[in-house]
Amino acid sequence: MAVPLTGSDRLFLGALGTAGDHRLHIALAARLPGPAPTSGELRRLAADSAARAPVLTYRLARGRWAPDPAFDPAHHVVEYRVAPGRDVCAAVVDAVRDNRLRPERPLWSLMAVHGYAEDEHVLCYRVHHAFQDGVGAARIAVRAVLLGRSVPAPDPTVAVRTPVRARMRLLSTGARLAAPSARLRPPPGTAGEAQPGARTFFLRLDVAAVHGIAAATGASVPQVGLAVLAGALRAWNPSRWRKAGRRGTTVSFPLNLNGRLRDGGLGNGTTTMPVVLPCAEPAPRERLRRVMEQTSVGRMAAYRRDRYPVKAPAAVFRLLRWLVSRAFLGRLTVSVIGVSLPLDGCFAVPPTYDTGGGVVSIVHSGTTVVASCVFSAAIAHADRLPGLMEQALDELRREVAR
């Protein structure tokens, strides 16, 4: 049965790109021990995953999501071999970039990246950002692909027309994210002669430090991650934040609406919540407290309840699309996803669509916390941010331990 597009689906397919645009592809990758699966094993895994998760058979058809009558799991597997010693994260980014999705088919693929080491390979689930948001993609990758569990079929009746009040609040959110206070403030300098595009960095954070801070303060892992990023941005451009009382950097913090819009993991079921990172605050623990205040369960529930883009009149949608096109320019989006896997190496590949800003996507489990960072090539000294995040985490850990 066909499922209508949500407002987010339409934005990602219309205002930001097309179904075949690899810059809007996202992925969840898992480093696994042993040799890569054979071609036959990979095809069987794709077929079994589609049987467990019917969403994997849906494609774009006449402005809706609909089951593909010619679905063939063999069209959704990719074997990508790299040279020995190749950096594993860079290899996965290359695999996503070099293997485009076909817009006439369901917008996903299962990729086996191997060759970089004799005793390890990567299994990567890649989708278009309109087909699934980060949480939806992680849910399918973990449940259907890696754990072999079933996922309900998409429900076409869940997505309903938004009330007028919700539309106005959503427009207000877009205006906040398009405001000057949301623009990234890099340190003085130039990005050199870098070509247009985006640069990707990966950072494995000290999981013991993250979990220790969370246990000692009552914070969640996402809250710790946001506070660490605030400290890194402060150290990145200290002259900007030396003045006390200066307003911080407003970032877009996506919230998944699974169950609110539809079940089954189909479409981009997210809204976004503005969070002001207190970069001007010199005390690490106070930065964490301010982040916790803005990301309370109550505030997130309110955004999930009444600020979601499903169906709206054409005029409202055009205004929202205009705001979104400005809300991403030079801005920062921060997402945090938890996965329940006993693996020591899960990480995300965020979209590489260059908006002049950046994306930080943190994937955490009981054993690892990995930050995947994508920044515009136009931003000076972006390569310093991963190291500054490590320093900010250590500063927060030491202050909490006092």
Annotated model-derived regions:
Residues 1-9, 23, 29-51, 58-355, ...:
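Soluble acyl-CoA-dependent acyltransferase catalytic core bearing the H(X)4D motif
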